[in-house]
Design a protein with these regions (language model features):
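FAD-site-proximal beta/loop scaffold in flavoenzymes
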Residues: 127-132
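Bacterial N-terminal signal peptides that target proteins for export
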Residues: 1-8
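Bacterial N-terminal signal peptides
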Residues: 8-16
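Conserved N-terminal structural module of periplasmic/extracytoplasmic solute-binding proteins
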Residues: 20-109, 118-125, 139
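Short, well-ordered junction/capping motifs at the entry into regular secondary structure
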Residues: 134-141
């Protein structure tokens, strides 16, 4: 399941590379810190370091986009996110457990990305069915 999540994460970052101008993006996560991950995803281990190495590689390949990572306190992650959505200071992207999607969807924090795949020439049929199930909520992706 971790490989599926990481594959989706890498695919999502690739969508960002189609941006036309310089962009700063913040990704928040709740599972550890990893500053020295490098950018070689083939030699990195541990979920936090693998994701950080994907971000580092993405940043190297896309100089007009700067993705930074914010590590949230594990025990307070969802409280922090709710507060930050309420005061318009939420991160651009954040990682969450699937069972939290309804909670955050109800406050308008979940974007439907269904049309984004086709927009960038990607086919949802290329996504592993189990991953597609995990990414689908209330008819959207």
């Amino acid at each position: 399941m971790k490989k599926i999540k990481l594959l989706f994460f890498a695919s999502f970052l690739s969508l960002l590379s189609f941006s036309a101008s310089a962009v700063d993006i913040t990704i928040a996560r709740f599972f550890g810190d990893c500053e020295d991950a490098g950018s070689d995803t083939t030699v990195t281990s541990g979920e936090a370091c693998i994701i950080q190495s994907i971000i580092n590689a993405f940043n190297e390949q896309n100089p007009d986009i700067n993705v930074t990572t914010e590590v949230l306190d594990w025990g307070q992650t969802y409280n922090i996110l709710q507060t930050r959505y309420a005061d318009n200071s939420a991160p651009d992207i954040h990682i969450m457990h699937r069972h939290r999607i309804p909670q955050f969807s109800s406050i308008g924090a979940i974007a439907d990305l269904s049309g984004e795949l086709e927009k960038y020439g990607m086919d949802s049929g290329d996504i592993v069915p189990m991953m597609m199930d995990a990414l689908t909520y209330d008819g959207g992706m």
